[in-house]
């Protein structure tokens, strides 16, 4: 995923990506903080969601894409400094749905954990993006 405009926007970096697994990171900057100077939950959510997609992406066949169906996230600790590190693993990959887990850390401290389901499909010819 060398061309990922959203990842570029938030400053997300790929550390490792292979079929069923990914690691990514984000250096905490002022733009990631809420008014209380804590990393906004949406930043952590975006890191987990992107990590899940990165873990699933290499398992896709030509012409297939994936899209988030749902994600459940638990936030364990407030984050004021970083960097944030996310490890994501595909737990189950079926023909049309995959279940993926992300764990987000600051150092060795687990600050959030997410579980998501992703649709796997071939897009229709109109109105949907294809696999890059």
Give the location of each predicted region.
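Terminal targeting signals and extreme-terminal segments of soluble enzymes
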Residues: 1-132
